[in-house]
From Swiss-Prot:
Function: Allows the formation of correctly charged Gln-tRNA(Gln) through the transamidation of misacylated Glu-tRNA(Gln) in the mitochondria. The reaction takes place in the presence of glutamine and ATP through an activated gamma-phospho-Glu-tRNA(Gln). Required for HMG2-induced ER-remodeling.
Superkingdom classification of source: Eukaryota
Catalytic residues in the record: 52, 130, 154
Gene (name only): HER2
Places the protein is found: Mitochondrion
SUPFAM superfamilies hit by this protein: Amidase signature (AS) enzymes (SSF75304)
GO cellular-component term (any): glutamyl-tRNA(Gln) amidotransferase complex
Alphabetical list of InterPro entries matching this protein: Amidase, Amidase_CS, Amidase_dom, AS_sf, GatA
Protein name stated in the entry: Glutamyl-tRNA(Gln) amidotransferase subunit A, mitochondrial
Length: 464
């Protein structure tokens, strides 16, 4: 039970926070009924977790916060959920999100927006998205940890806004089987918690090859990663020159410089580094991810599962459009953009070019890290860096009203929130957002080479 509260107190807090902040889409009818299994040092027995509502569970509905899946219940658990249950974790409920994981504000949900608990309730500040409910459940101490998904920053941004830890592991390390796809070349199951030791334990519990997931990192490559590990002293940390800090929130620079001073005092070496391709990352991301989303969401046709209008006088060719009208505005925008990017001329001029630029970005990351990349056969740069530190967000959480007004002017206004998080998603790198100060929505990402998740976790633990 989070923070070892009494059962009665925990249930009262759950009810209060849910009514205030709109965190969950469904809640376990027996919240905090902890298992009697005996735990070990490596298991999570007795821990309470929340699961983002785009990860399937057989005990709860899985709606993706969308009308089109409003009553859907999966006949099986996602692999990550199955592993948590085997480890003795109690699932408190499913958390609210931007519909199908598309959004950075936590406002695009049939359940309504998630409200940031760091601020007075009447301020109605955004939580960030799309794993908004997951971050809020951790920020409110309702759970020990939460599972979210991160496509372009969807775990790290709300973690930053909720002043908690948010970890996106290397792509392929955690199984995606049972995760409802948004963009399959980017989607990654992520972990949120207030405690790095809990987050690490969850990662080790879930970090397993899954034959049901075609993108799961093979046993051979996992062994190769382990074989590449060696003691690197002192650690070399890079600051990316292309990421401007000029427009950062008030308070960022003081906290940031304080951290750098702490790292230097600990004996770490700090270097500036150039990664020119990061300037292309938002156009790359918003070319590739909507195209993959358009393809993935074509399965919601009203025939096999999901919403189907029972009042329709079904005639040839009219079923598909009324069914898909149940998608929300942001999802429709991305489907339209994705289909455009896949049409003949745009495919050659935009999509193929974006894929090539993505490869260039990965090559540049490979060139600056000491640790080799097992996916690209990069040998690593002997004089390179071990980690990068990058801001998580260029803004503080605004009000829900202001966010919606800006997005109404142009959907692209909200896309800029991903500027610091998207590069790591495109390259599949492990990235952990950590708060620079307790209960303050200013965060910093710690980024490692592909597969070098342990160095990221070790570093954050060492400075926590």
């Amino acid at each position: 039970m989070p923070l070892k509260r009494s059962l009665k107190e925990s249930i009262e807090r759950l009810s209060s926070f849910q009514s205030k902040y709109n965190i969950f889409t469904s809640i376990n009818p027996s919240p905090y009924s902890i298992t009697n299994k005996k735990g070990t040092k490596e298991t999570l027995t007795g821990c309470v977790a929340s699961i983002k509502d785009n990860i399937v569970t057989k005990d709860f509905p899985t709606t993706c916060a969308s009308h089109i899946l409003e009553n859907f219940k999966s006949p099986f658990d996602a692999t990550v959920v199955k592993l948590l249950k085997q480890a003795g974790v109690h699932i408190l409920g499913k958390t609210n999100l931007d519909e199908f994981g598309m959004g950075s504000g936590g406002v695009h949900s049939i359940r309504g927006p998630v409200i940031n608990p760091l601020y007075p309730h009447e301020d109605k500040k955004i939580m960030g998205g799309s794993s908004s409910g997951a971050a809020a459940s951790v920020a409110c101490d309702l759970v020990d940890f939460a599972l979210g998904t991160d496509t372009g920053g969807s775990v790290r941004l709300p973690a930053c806004y909720g002043s908690v830890l948010g970890f996106k592991p290397s792509y392929g390390r955690l199984s995606r089987f049972g995760v409802i796809a948004y963009s399959q070349s980017l989607d990654t199951v992520g972990i949120l918690s207030k405690k790095i030791n809990v987050l690490r334990k969850v990662f080790h519990t879930l970090d397993k090859y899954d034959m049901k997931d075609p993108t799961s990192l093979s046993v051979e490559l996992r062994e190769l990663i382990e074989g590449n590990k060696k003691v690197r002293r002192p650690l070399k940390v890079g600051i990316v020159k292309e990421f401007s800090h000029e427009s950062m929130p008030i308070g960022f620079h003081r906290l940031y410089l304080s951290l750098l001073e702490k790292l230097i005092n600990l004996g770490l070496e700090i270097y500036p580094v150039s990664i020119p391709s990061v300037k292309n990352c938002l156009p790359i991301y918003y070319t590739l991810s909507p195209a993959e989303a358009a393809s993935n969401l074509s399965r919601y046709d009203g025939i096999r599962y999901g919403y189907r209008d029972s009042e329709l006088d079904i005639k040839d060719g009219i079923l598909f459009a009324p069914t898909r009208s149940k998608f929300g505005t942001e999802v429709k925008n991305r489907i339209i953009l994705g289909n455009y990017n896949l049409c003949s001329d745009a495919f050659k001029n935009n999509f193929i070019k974006a894929e090539k630029l993505r490869v260039n970005l990965i090559d540049e990351f490979d060139g600056i890290f000491r640790f080799p990349n097992v996916l690209t056969n990069s040998k690593g740069n002997p004089d390179g860096l071990d980690l990068l530190i990058v801001p998580t967000s260029s803004k503080l959480p605004g009000s829900i009203r202001d966010f919606e007004e800006e997005e109404a002017k142009s959907p692209a206004n909200s896309y800029i929130n991903d500027v610091f998080t998207v590069p790591m998603s495109l390259a599949g790198l492990p990235s952990l957002s950590m708060p620079l100060k307790e209960k303050t929505p200013i965060g910093l990402q710690v980024v490692g080479q592909y597969g070098d998740d342990s160095t990221v976790l070790d570093f954050v633990e060492s400075i926590s």
